[in-house]
Amino acid sequence: MKLEDTTILITGGSRGLGLALAEASAKTGARVALVARDRTELDAAVARIRAAGGHAHGIVADVGDKRAIHRIAGEAAAVLGPIDVLVNNASTLGPTPLRLLLDTECEDLERVLEVNLVGPFRLTRVIAGSMALRDRGVVINISSDAAVEAYPSWGAYSIAKAALDHLTRIWAAELVGTGVRVISVDPGEMNTRMHAEAIPGADPATLGDPVRVAAQIIAMLRDPETAASGTRQVAASWEVPR
């Protein structure tokens, strides 16, 4: 897929992997829409991309709020053009320190599901139709190794990510023949604020670099043969793009 002059919408785009991917996307010549809740962080991210010569637009919104979904998709398309790539990256751990399921409030589980699962479903549902009409598009759902491992105290997050992986497979099966690919990406443990909140004592030197993972995702987008629709891609197993 040629990324120059495409529109890429990235949720959770103001920091971590989302920001790294937004910067990498802009460097390819893509127009990038970043979605985040914090206006200050979002404005700083957009300014950083523009200062480097990229084309970026920020949208302050919470993907866990169903009232924001149509506004996100509509504003991104109105300002930057039809969306070619959707990256469902926004995520929440729930309350930290992380809790065992016995200590997890139903409301906290509901919030994690709204952001990590229902939000991606809603955005994909709004955007994938227009992608199919143009016979092209990619949806990337950012997953986690917690989706396939039973880590104590990661229950709410793990449940949401496991469901997101299966949602990816169902979307892919239902969109066969439309030109739209839907892929899960497990980026692995990365040196991000979110990881530090989950595991405060982790050694940053042992964690992955969001910039490297972003470069790998860009390489995957450029070459559709590297990731079939409906697959779960694990960043740790990818070769480093040159």
Question: Residue locations for each model-derived region?
Answer:
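C-terminal helical subdomain
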Residues: G177-V180, S184-V185, T192, P200-R242
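Conserved glycine-rich cofactor-binding loop
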Residues: G12-R15
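Active-site helix of classical SDR
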Residues: T124, A160
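Alpha-helical segment proximal to the catalytic Tyr-Lys
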Residues: G129, A172-E174
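Residue(s) in the substrate-gating loop at a strand-loop-helix junction
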Residues: S144
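The beta1-alpha1 cofactor-binding region of Rossmann-like NAD(H)/NADP(H)-dependent oxidoreductases
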Residues: R39-T40, V60-I72, C106
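Substrate-binding pocket helix/loop in short-chain dehydrogenase/reductase
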Residues: P97-L101, E105-E110
